[in-house]
Amino acid sequence: MNEHALKNIPLRLYNTAERQKQELKPIKGNHIQLYTCGPTVYHYAHIGNFRTYIFEDLLRRTIQFFGFSITQVMNLTDVDDKTIRGAIAKGITLDEYTKPYKDAFFEDLKTLNIQSAEYYPAATDYIPAMIEMIKVLLDKKVAYKGGDGSIYYAINQFPRYGCLSHLHLEDLQAGASERVAADEYEKEHVADFVLWKSYDSERDGQIYWESPFGLGRPGWHLECSAMAMHLLGETIDIHVGGIDNMFPHHENEIAQSEACSGKKFVNLWMHAEHLVVDQKKMSKSLGNFYTLRDLLNKGFTGIQVRYLLLQTHYKTQLNFTFQGVESVKSSLQRLNDFIQRIYNIQTLQSDGQVDLLVNDALIRFAEALADDLNISSALAAIFDFVREINCLCDVNQVSQKEAETVINLMKKFDTILGVLTFDKREESIPVDLQEAFAKRQQARQEKNWTLSDELRDFIHQRGYLIEDTPQGTRLKKQ
């Protein structure tokens, strides 16, 4: 398996800001700094969230596949409009409200075999860093105090505002007299956005922090800027999230971070498309809102859900159906059965085709991933390889040594997929076949060739072979 050839394949990823694919070139050496938007822990994450997290996991694994080292930060938003409302409604502290959802999120990551990030910062642990950023923005006259006591970002003081979502600042009607205090809003409501939300006892209960600007709490957009810059530096290689994060969240992150540091915040932006259910937007009112736990309760496994969310390109809208999950079962079964078949190869000689097929499959797989994570083409390379090797197995043209190479390639594929099983299964031979085999052995000793042949044919009809080995005669699945 020629892994050296992978070094000559450039990894090209689609940059949302530039609207084109670009070769990944690290800021420092061979190391990638990756910031991925994590959950707002006001509820259990739903399968639409996990579509994005699976994409982020695919990106992380691909970066490593091509030989880069990585530091990944995935934030946990544990203070925002929704978490505060939830805590107040239940009459508990913010931490008491968010902790069960944080714990559940990490359980779900494990269930889906999503690799761990190096850092999972919670917003409430970085309030001092956020306050310091606001001080800098106020000093630079990019932020101001509104009549409601909150601190706002003046978007007309940042000429590049709109660079990510391709809005034109001169066309916007925002200004000091137009502000938005909500964490989430649409493009038609573009306005100066909140950095520090002034405390309101009716709205916020007992949830607030002290600051030089008065009691309150940070705006959602500021949280990610502060955590990203604190943990990864003023300029990072890649920032990733769902397409719904692009505006206003990521747009506002750029404005805050670059105004604060005077440097480019992110070199490459990537966004995953939405997930829909049966071609409809997921919503509780339509009864098509599913968490991972809902799917597990319906009998599906985390690996099946992972494969389903993985197999569609991240820039394509993913249509979730239960028929789709069922089809995934057969795909995984085919791959895992293939692995078991290769484990059972006993042939010592072959015609030498396997090494060529292994190298071709690896290059096809790598080139597909290098083309903006083209997972459908990567999967096609795997299934073509499985078909070709199965054909060789049918005519006993895969040796034991080559079988090891095939297994190693499947393990290499699974560093990306994270769905295969490599535990060798011991076949359980039915009792009646074991009895027939023992009777045949006895018949041969007694030279009862007619009975011996009848029992051999019975065993063959049931899908088993009688194989002679150095350890003696045994039954083997065909």
Curated annotation (Swiss-Prot):
One Gene Ontology term of the molecular function aspect: zinc ion binding
Record family assignment: Belongs to the class-I aminoacyl-tRNA synthetase family.
Encoding gene, per UniProt annotation: cysS
Record note on quaternary structure: Monomer.
Gene3D superfamilies in the record: Cysteine-tRNA ligase, C-terminal anti-codon recognition domain (1.20.120.1910), HUPs (3.40.50.620)
Organism whose genome encodes this protein: Protochlamydia amoebophila (strain UWE25)
Cellular localisation: Cytoplasm
Catalytic activity: tRNA(Cys) + L-cysteine + ATP = L-cysteinyl-tRNA(Cys) + AMP + diphosphate
Swiss-Prot/TrEMBL keywords: Aminoacyl-tRNA synthetase, ATP-binding, Cytoplasm, Ligase, Metal-binding, Nucleotide-binding, Protein biosynthesis, Zinc
Entries under InterPro entries matching the protein: Cys-tRNA-ligase, Cys-tRNA-synt_Ia_DALR, Cys-tRNA/MSH_ligase, Rossmann-like_a/b/a_fold, tRNA-synt_1_cat_dom, tRNAsynth_Ia_anticodon-bd
GO cellular component assignments: cytosol
'KMSKS' region, short sequence motif: residues: 281-285
Full protein name: Cysteine--tRNA ligase
Upper lineage: Bacteria, Pseudomonadati, Chlamydiota, Chlamydiia, Parachlamydiales
UniProt: ATP binding residues: K284
Needed cofactors: Zn(2+)
Binding site for Zn(2+): C37, C224, H249, E253
Presence of the UniProt keyword Cytoplasm in the record: yes
